[in-house]
Amino acid sequence: PVDHKKIGLMYTATAFFAFALAGVFSLLIRTQLAVPNNQFLTGEQYNQILTLHGATMLFFFIIQAGLTGFGNFVVPLMLGARDVALPRVNAFSYWAFLGAIVLALMSYFFPGGAPSVGWTFYYPFSAQSGSGVDFYLAAILLLGFSSLLGNANFIATHCAPDDAAK
C-alpha cells in the first residue's frame, strides 16, 4: 500500500511491536535485579539485553511511533493534501524500517552475540567486535536511511505546489 494513512498505521503497529519486545527485555532486566546475586543472566547477557532494550525503545519505538507513524498519518491531512509527495518512497521507507528491526534482532544470533555496548554506542564500550555488533550497526544505519527518506518526503510534501499535493 502507498496510502499515507495505511503506512502511518503500519509504522505505528510495527513500533508497538518493538515496544512489546523492549518490554520483554525490560522484564528480563528486572528479573535479574529482583534479588541480590541473582544468576538469571550472566554479566554479558545482562549488558546485551540492556543495550537491546535501550536501543529498541529509543530508535524503534519512540522515534518511529511518535514522529514517523503519527507524521505519516497527520501531515498530509494538515496540509490538505491527498497523500505525501512521494508515496512510493514513503512505502520504501517503512520497509527499510521493518528491515532494520529484523537486522537488529538477527544480531543476537551471530558469533559474539548481540552488542553489549550500551544504546549510545560510545567508545569504551563500542570497541567490542563481532558479527552481532556489525549487524546491529547496519540496522541503525538502515533505520537512519529510512528516517531520512521519510522526513525528506514530509519536506517535499510541505513544499509541493498546491496543485501537485492536492
Give the positions of each predicted feature.
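...captures the hydrophobic TM-helix bundle architecture rather than a specific catalytic motif
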Residues: 1-166
